[in-house]
Amino acid sequence: MLRVPEPRPGEAKAEGAAPPTPSKPLTSFLIQDILRDGAQRQGGRTSSQRQRDPEPEPEPEPEGGRSRAGAQNDQLSTGPRAAPEEAETLAETEPERHLGSYLLDSENTSGALPRLPQTPKQPQKRSRAAFSHTQVIELERKFSHQKYLSAPERAHLAKNLKLTETQVKIWFQNRRYKTKRKQLSSELGDLEKHSSLPALKEEAFSRASLVSVYNSYPYYPYLYCVGSWSPAFW
């Protein structure tokens, strides 16, 4: 009789532990699943390619080459950012440059142009205060009783007439000056009226002065004696 070989204990365990063979996965024909499967496959290929082909280590460059490369990288990195900053600085400095050139041109041309004669400034005339009829009557009435006002009286009068103290003070000063001038003119008129001396013209006055001088020093013709001579007529 044929003997069936008995399985060994290790082999039996291995055969018993082997998982069942998985069935073939079902493929979906939806567009989303097809695109997703293609992207996953492409990503898996690239990752496996990277793992197989490691990137070569960069060779050490000399200091000069490194500085040049760094400068080029800085220029490339700061190029688009520096462009608007340079445009802003140019826009800010452009008016200042034009202003400086304009000032220089004006200084150069100012010496060539003839200077116009400067007209002397006329002194500004002080505006006169316009008094109303009622204010003038009250001021005249106060002036007829009192020619000079104290500070409290002037303030009280200015408050009643709705004027400033300076206006009241100036009005009284002008009124006193006008009164004195009238008095002087009237006194001179009285002197001319009551004067007894006749009014002489300039020629008459000169003739009268000569006659008075001649009469004050009379002249008597006679001969003086010379030696033993005696006057002939006396």
Curated annotation (Swiss-Prot):
Key words, A-Z: DNA-binding, Homeobox, Nucleus, Repressor, Transcription, Transcription regulation, Tumor suppressor, Ubl conjugation
Biased composition (Low complexity): 40-49
Known DNA-binding region: 124-183
Family matches, as CDD domains: homeodomain
Compositional bias per record (Basic and acidic residues), positions renumbered to this chain: 1-14
Tissue: Highly expressed in the prostate and, at a lower level, in the testis.
Region described as Disordered: spans on this chain: 1-131
DNA repair keyword on record: no
GO CC terms of this entry: chromatin; cytosol; nucleoplasm; nucleus; site of DNA damage
InterPro entries associated with the record: HD, HD_metazoa, Homeobox_CS, Homeobox_NK-like, Homeodomain-like_sf
GO MF, one annotated term: DNA-binding transcription factor activity
Membership in a protein family: Belongs to the NK-3 homeobox family.
Function in brief: Transcription factor, which binds preferentially the consensus sequence 5'-TAAGT[AG]-3' and can behave as a transcriptional repressor. Plays an important role in normal prostate development, regulating proliferation of glandular epithelium and in the formation of ducts in prostate. Acts as a tumor suppressor controlling prostate carcinogenesis, as shown by the ability to inhibit proliferation and invasion activities of PC-3 prostate cancer cells.
Subunit structure: Interacts with serum response factor (SRF). Interacts with SPDEF. Interacts with WDR77. Interacts with TOPORS which polyubiquitinates NKX3-1 and induces its proteasomal degradation. Interacts with FEM1B.
Name recorded for this polypeptide: Homeobox protein Nkx-3.1
Organism: Homo sapiens (Human)
